Amino acid sequence: MPRSLKKSPFVAYHLLKKINQMNKAGKKDTITTWSRSSTILPSMIGFTIAVYNGKQHVPIFISDQLVGHKLGEFVSTRNFRTHIKADRKTKR
């Protein structure tokens, strides 16, 4: 269910503050964050944001196609490892 149009999109305050400071300074450094629920805004385009997946920070380059999505959509938290196929020699 999408967020109500009466409300503005959710962005963590500390993340928005860092982006605004870096826009004023003209820097494009990597920003680390744990806020997976923050919405990507047009002011974030061109930045690299490292989002925490539970183990490490995964960098995401923000482009215009990602605007409106959440940061957590692009970083997987679960790692599926394929099942080991049974070796025929060990079954004998």
UniProtKB/Swiss-Prot annotation:
PROSITE patterns: RIBOSOMAL_S19 (PS00323). Its main location: plastid. Coiled coil: none annotated. GO terms for molecular function: rRNA binding; structural constituent of ribosome. GO terms for biological process: ribosomal small subunit assembly; translation. One of its GO terms (cellular component) is chloroplast. Keywords: Chloroplast, Plastid, Ribonucleoprotein, Ribosomal protein, RNA-binding, rRNA-binding. PANTHER family: RIBOSOMAL PROTEIN S19P FAMILY MEMBER, SMALL RIBOSOMAL SUBUNIT PROTEIN US19M. Protein S19 forms a complex with S13 that binds strongly to the 16S ribosomal RNA. This is Small ribosomal subunit protein uS19c. It comes from Phaeodactylum tricornutum (strain CCAP 1055/1).
